[in-house]
């Protein structure tokens, strides 16, 4: 994977995985140790996590598909009634194949996979890629959901969807949720998002995602946006689905026009 180099503190608090092993893993993804970075990628005995060392109260960012928020969402969430499920076109027995081209921490993708969709993940930031990979590997071992996730949720070893071939790597739906500069009020709501945005920043080239997404999608491209954000590429969608704080802009694929 050809990533531009990322400098971040690398720390091991694990009794099983050494700092040398963490450094070697990161080197494969062009991540190097930078002791001056306020961000740290930390290997604990349980997981890989991201911390903002100068703001410890923000807590750690990590991927957990088994417990916490995702367990609650799986058991008590809306399932097929969730906004993201409706946006990608889940209806009756129709379960579209999905490429989530801006996977982030994988939460929307997990919801779709738990419903039964085959979902492939693309994540271009190398640190987020490692967090996702770690979370998936742990979830694959879970007795309750491991087998389902091994069948339905896979992380692709590519950096950008323009590396995928529309003739062979297509899907029914391509899902885009590019990072967008948050209004200060909303940025303070989720502490985790502040850590994440410090690492990733806004997707300033998010407009470059729409064309390759349209080429890969047989049925539709779904773009999740804050309700105050402009359309991706300034391109009017065929229609939108609105929620309390977001909207899903939906562009029908060539076969559906």
Swiss-Prot record:
S-adenosyl-L-methionine binds at residues 107-108, 123-124, 177. SUPFAM superfamilies: S-adenosyl-L-methionine-dependent methyltransferases (SSF53335). It catalyses: guanosine(1516) in 16S rRNA + S-adenosyl-L-methionine = N(2)-methylguanosine(1516) in 16S rRNA + S-adenosyl-L-homocysteine + H(+). It comes from the Bacteria. Keywords: Cytoplasm, Methyltransferase, rRNA processing, S-adenosyl-L-methionine, Transferase. It is found in: Cytoplasm. One of its GO terms (cellular component) is cytoplasm. It holds the Pfam family SAM_MT. Its EC number is 2.1.1.242. GO terms for molecular function: rRNA (guanine-N2-)-methyltransferase activity. It is an enzyme of class 2 (transferase). Specifically methylates the guanosine in position 1516 of 16S rRNA. HAMAP family: 16SrRNA_methyltr_J. Belongs to the methyltransferase superfamily. RsmJ family. This is Ribosomal RNA small subunit methyltransferase J. The gene is rsmJ.
């Amino acid at each position: 994977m050809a990533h531009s180099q990322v400098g971040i503190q690398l720390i091991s608090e694990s009794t099983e995985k050494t700092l040398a092993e963490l450094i070697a893993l990161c080197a494969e993804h062009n991540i190097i140790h930078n002791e001056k970075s306020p961000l740290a990628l930390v290997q604990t005995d349980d997981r890989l996590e991201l911390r903002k060392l100068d703001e410890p109260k923000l807590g750690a960012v990590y991927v957990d598909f088994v417990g916490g928020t995702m367990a609650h969402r799986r058991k008590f969430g809306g399932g097929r009634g969730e906004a993201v499920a409706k946006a990608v076109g889940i209806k009756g027995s129709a379960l579209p194949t999905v490429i989530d081209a801006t996977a982030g921490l994988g939460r929307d993708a997990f919801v779709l996979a738990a419903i039964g969709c085959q979902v492939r993940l693309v994540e271009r930031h190398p640190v987020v890629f490692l967090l996702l990979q770690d979370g998936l590997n742990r979830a694959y071992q879970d007795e309750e959901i491991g087998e389902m996730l091994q069948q339905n949720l896979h992380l692709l070893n590519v950096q950008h969807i323009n590396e995928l071939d529309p003739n062979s790597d297509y899907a029914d739906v391509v899902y885009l949720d590019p990072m967008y500069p948050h209004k200060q009020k909303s940025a303070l709501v989720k502490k985790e998002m502040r850590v994440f945005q410090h690492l990733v920043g806004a997707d300033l080239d998010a407009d470059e995602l729409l064309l390759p997404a349209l080429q890969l999608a047989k049925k539709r491209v779904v773009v999740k946006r804050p309700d105050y954000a402009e359309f991706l590429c300034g391109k009017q969608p065929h229609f939108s689905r609105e929620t309390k704080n977001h909207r899903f802009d939906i562009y029908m694929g060539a076969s559906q026009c």
